[in-house]
Amino acid sequence: MAIGLVGKKCGMTRVFTEAGASIPVTVVEISANRITQVKNTDVDGYQAIQVTTGTRRDSRVTAAQKGHFAKAGVAAGRGVWEFRANDSDLEGREIGGEILADLFEQGQMVDVTGSSKGKGFQGPVKRHNFSMQDATHGNSVSHRAHGSTGQNQSPGKVFKGKKMAGQMGNKRVTVQGLEVISVDAEKGLLVIKGAIPGATGGDVIVRPSVKA
């Protein structure tokens, strides 16, 4: 395992290569990831680094969270994230320290995790890419319906996991194998090739690619 960074999706734009090719990119803002806890095998049963980022109003922080942040000596953030780590990842990482955008470098491959945009309750045509039924020729009301969902008296039920209408989006999604086009450590910006999950302003987790 390798540690990563928590950032905020700023939106998409494009950059041009020296040859004039246009590359679609996503800009991720990386505020300093403050280390709130370093877990080890003896105490916690596994090795990990816990971080927070951003700020949160004092009235929005629970008493337990206040104590946790105070013990680490860091300002309260908008959440807490954890990265599994090995011995080399933990070297030089101490509670209260910071992890910055320069953790990554240009040309590195990364995996990005975020929450996909919520679409609400959607039908099977939009949600599962089902084909529509006939527009006319005796079909009424069922143009975008999914049709039969079961068999007969045996099994006499609808199987779990059947593709039907329901909540779409707002799921944890990971896109793998994206290239880091550039890193601006001073401004705390990562420019990543392609699209990443979630809406503008949403939190995303950037890790070194597991398949690189």
Curated annotation (Swiss-Prot):
Residue ranges of the region described as Disordered: 135-162
Ranges of Polar residues composition bias in the record: 135-155
Post-translational modification: Methylated by PrmB.
N5-methylglutamine: residues bearing it: 153
Source domain of life: Bacteria
GO biological process, one term: translation
InterPro entries named in the record: Ribosomal_uL3, Ribosomal_uL3_bac/org-type, Ribosomal_uL3_CS, Transl_B-barrel_sf
One Gene Ontology MF term: rRNA binding
Annotated GO CC locations: cytosolic large ribosomal subunit
Ribonucleoprotein listed as a keyword: yes
PROSITE patterns in the cross-refs: RIBOSOMAL_L3 (PS00474)
Subunit details: Part of the 50S ribosomal subunit. Forms a cluster with proteins L14 and L19.
NCBIfam families attached to this UniProt entry: L3_bact
Function: One of the primary rRNA binding proteins, it binds directly near the 3'-end of the 23S rRNA, where it nucleates assembly of the 50S subunit.
Family, as annotated: Belongs to the universal ribosomal protein uL3 family.
Protein name per its UniProtKB record: Large ribosomal subunit protein uL3
